[in-house]
Amino acid sequence: MTFKNKLKFYVITDRKYSCEVYSVEQALKGGATAVQLRMKSSNTREMVEVGQKIRKLTLEYDALFFVNDRLDIAQAVKSDGIHVGIDDISISKIKEIAPELIIGASAYNINEMKIAESEGADYLGVGSVYPTNTKLDARYLGLNGLKELSNCSNLPVVAIGGINHENVKEVLMCGVSGVAVVSAIVGANDIIFSAKKMNEIIKKYI
C-alpha cells in the first residue's frame, strides 16, 4: 500500500473518549490505515511510553504513525511522521532536524495550503469540514471550502472535523485522499465495529 493510500482512513486519539493504546489497537483491527497520537495535556514521559506502544501496533498492522506537534516525541518513538498546525514548529525546521519524517500540515484556506506546500509538507489536513466537539476553536470550512482546497492542492488532502458515518460519503466525494476521524471511532462503544463500518464506506470511494 502506498503512502497516499495509507492516508485514506486516519484515526486520531483523544483521551476524553478512550485510552490511546486501546483505541488505536481496536481501530487498527477495524481497518484504520493511519494513526495520530494527540495528547495535548500529557507530560513528555507519558507521551513517549504511550507512543512506543502505538509504534509497535502500527508496525504490526502496517499502518502509518504520526505524532501531533511534538518533534521530540516523534523522534523518540520513531514515528513515521509528525502533524503540525500553522502556529507550531515550522515545516522547514522539521525538515532540517528530521528529514526522514513525513510531514502533515493543517490548512484552513488557500494561503495556508500554499505556505505548507512551499515549505515542503507531504500531505494536508484540511478542515474543520463540520463543527466538532473535539476542537471547539476550530474554524468551520464546509464542503465547498474542502472541495476548493482539494482541487487546488498538489498534495494529498485528508479531510478532518466532525466526520462520521452519516456524512463521510459526501466528504469523500470532494476529491480527498482520506478522512481523519476522532469521536466517530475512538468515542464509539464498539471501536472495531465502528472502524469496520467506516472502512467499508471509504473503500467504495477511495
Curated annotation (Swiss-Prot):
GO terms for cellular component: cytoplasm. Keywords: Magnesium, Metal-binding, Thiamine biosynthesis, Transferase. It catalyses: 2-[(2R,5Z)-2-carboxy-4-methylthiazol-5(2H)-ylidene]ethyl phosphate + 4-amino-2-methyl-5-(diphosphooxymethyl)pyrimidine + 2 H(+) = thiamine phosphate + CO2 + diphosphate; 2-(2-carboxy-4-methylthiazol-5-yl)ethyl phosphate + 4-amino-2-methyl-5-(diphosphooxymethyl)pyrimidine + 2 H(+) = thiamine phosphate + CO2 + diphosphate; 4-methyl-5-(2-phosphooxyethyl)-thiazole + 4-amino-2-methyl-5-(diphosphooxymethyl)pyrimidine + H(+) = thiamine phosphate + diphosphate. Binds 1 Mg(2+) ion per subunit. Pathway: Cofactor biosynthesis; thiamine diphosphate biosynthesis; thiamine phosphate from 4-amino-2-methyl-5-diphosphomethylpyrimidine and 4-methyl-5-(2-phosphoethyl)-thiazole: step 1/1. Its cofactor is Mg(2+). 2-[(2R,5Z)-2-carboxy-4-methylthiazol-5(2H)-ylidene]ethyl phosphate binds at T132, N133, T134, G162, V182, S183. Its EC number is 2.5.1.3. Condenses 4-methyl-5-(beta-hydroxyethyl)thiazole monophosphate (THZ-P) and 2-methyl-4-amino-5-hydroxymethyl pyrimidine pyrophosphate (HMP-PP) to form thiamine monophosphate (TMP). NCBIfam families: thiE. This is Thiamine-phosphate synthase. It comes from Methanococcus vannielii (strain ATCC 35089 / DSM 1224 / JCM 13029 / OCM 148 / SB). The gene is thiE.
